[in-house]
């Protein structure tokens, strides 16, 4: 179980050759401007190279999968895109969905301090396709559809260059844009604005894949959805939602699931009223509220300073999500597909605290600070106020110095927001009969030395550059480009691309040329992903037991004591 599994360079070369199933050189004709016919019209893309191989990739950017959600269609479910005449240029990056670019800019600290900022527009429901150049139409390569993260308020499809993953993994990669923030997730809780429109954008993109991916060389019967952070929340939501039935066949989440606190809400009306009041709209009538917000300029909705730190969650609406995710998981009416999911070993170390403005507070963290910051999330988890200090003290232990308190705070927040929800979700899937493969990514990218303190390990999002082949991307301005990667990191990226794409191809990340990856069964084995990977068992066992057994038991005992006390008082 604890046996180290070493991966030598020669094996990695074999991994790549095995996955490509063809010579490293491009076997098809080199076409500088490839063209493909879709059901809506013809598109013209461009070809790009990838470092380390002569294989070329056809890239098509900004293909519409839905009509622009403007005017009366703002806050509505997406409508199918309209056909076009002639050949549509798909060679340049499309605008991002409307968002606060300043917030988007902070995500450059995921890897190396770089971040491409594209123009923004409400007319943004497009996707990008990356396909190996020599793959003929109808050849049936696995399809991997990526949903970006960004707390459901920022992000762009083009920030994730799929060319290296397509070339080395011999897959067709699709990256999707969806409406964000108030435009993507505003809900009145009724028919006037049911909510989840950003989620439904992703569903519409998956329908486009079913209807159009074959001419790009993809297999519509072998579609893997994958996403990171909030994108992972959407992916896990697709597994639970009846509206996504039959649109995908495997799923991957990276540091995010829909049971993360705050990501979905059953009572959207109070937030709708807050938004309306802030923007000088009626806060009593849903119909008047929606009509007023539809008439506002998009920038006014997105850039309002009073709404700057507002989170816009998914909504339990009775249709897209018939019940809460936890209820759906318990009742098991969801799509049973192979699932690969995992976390990083330092999720709440630097990137998320920086985005939340907590870095300075963390340096001089006190018990009172920790309790104050954690109160909202503990409240959402139904922890009684009287018991919150008990939870905090469980993490603090006897530590008194600021550094130890900071570390305890990071562990607590990482567990609450990512680790515990991911493990819990894994267990539900496993118990339903779905094959599950769990990982913990543990490698600190060498590029962190430029932008993050030495104590930061595998921060939130650190795995992305390895999954997308960052060391091999030609465009070094790309968010995930990693030209300074060490040889060890290049090999790690090759391995992870091989594992992710083999899972997309077969539903299992294991092959003879790859490190053994145990299935997450009752023994709860998982893979510790490092340059020298090894199998682990019972991820953070003591803390998972605390949250799944010890704390619920203590809360139940507390409620019983309160009930008994009230009964005594009533005598």
From Swiss-Prot:
MF (Gene Ontology): carboxylesterase activity; carboxylic ester hydrolase activity
Organism of origin: Homo sapiens
Compartment(s) of residence: Endoplasmic reticulum lumen
Tissue-specific expression: Expressed in liver, colon and small intestine.
Family: Belongs to the type-B carboxylesterase/lipase family.
Family annotation (Pfam families): COesterase (PF00135)
Keywords of this entry: Disulfide bond, Endoplasmic reticulum, Glycoprotein, Hydrolase, Serine esterase, Signal
SS bond list: 97-124, 281-292
Residues modified by glycosylation: 105
Gene name of this polypeptide: CES3
Post-translational modification: N-glycosylated.
GO biological process: low-density lipoprotein particle clearance; xenobiotic metabolic process
CDD domains: Esterase_lipase
Signal peptide: 1-26
Protein name per UniProt: Carboxylesterase 3
Record's catalysed reaction(s): a carboxylic ester + H2O = an alcohol + a carboxylate + H(+)
Positions of the catalytic residues: 229 (acyl-ester intermediate), 347 (charge relay system), 460 (charge relay system)
Coiled-coil features, chain-numbered ranges: none
InterPro entries assigned to the protein according to its UniProt record, in alphabetical order: AB_hydrolase_fold, CarbesteraseB, Carboxylesterase_B_AS, Type-B_Carboxylest/Lipase
Short motif (Prevents secretion from ER): ranges: 568-571
